[in-house]
Amino acid sequence: MGGCVGSHHDSSGSLNENSDGTGVALGRNQPLKREKPKWKSDYPMTDGQLRSKRDEFWDTAPAFEGRKEIWDALKAAAQAFESNDHELAQAIIDGASITLPHGALTECYDELGNRYQLPVYCLSPPVNMIEEKSESETIEVPEAPASEGQECQLRLRLSTGRDLRLAVRTSDSVQQMKRRLQTQEGVAATSQRWFFSGRPLTDKMKLEELKISRDYVVQVIVSQPPTTPPLPQNPTPVEN
């Protein structure tokens, strides 16, 4: 998934040199290259699944090593880079004093020598992306009869920071459980993205197929419409 580890320094205090004998130190800063990484996912991925994977990384990466303000800067730089705003991405990197030994966001260092690694899926979509069906094209999943499956409590952790238990049946599909959460908490089913152990859960998956133990937590990413930041106001001059 990528992450942050301590950088490796030699006895002179500089980063180790390349093994090709060029003598170019890995710690020497290089400008951000414009080329985006090309990669293929292990399975065809929709835009929603890619967003879930990215959200999971950015939600958990700062919890390991490194400084949160650097992770925030790297996230902003990655978003600008993917949007082809190369100048903004470079400005963010320079402003946070981030070093790129290879000119790529896949390996970065802060001023303290901490190493940060961004996975390629945070920088560009895979070559095997597939279109996500619109709501009108989505096949309705029939509700399971109330007599089918066993009743149980499913532990959920919402991206809003709330933990809760949801009354479900083992025969429920993910789509049906989304509707139950919508009824209980008022969270629109279409704005929910569920994943368990880093795996996106599709609407047709059945709870009994997922083999989720009682003590495990299913994470729910709730998509929220972007808010427009308020325009800065001119400060009122202070009279002497």
UniProtKB/Swiss-Prot annotation:
SUPFAM superfamilies: Ubiquitin-like. Disulfide bonds: none annotated. Residues 12-21 have a biased composition (Polar residues). It holds the Pfam family ubiquitin. InterPro entries: DC-UbP/UBTD2_N (IPR032752), DC-UbP/UBTD2_N_sf (IPR038169), Ubiquitin-like_dom (IPR000626), Ubiquitin-like_domsf (IPR029071), UBTD1/2 (IPR039869). It is found in: Cytoplasm. It comes from the Eukaryota. This is Ubiquitin domain-containing protein 2.
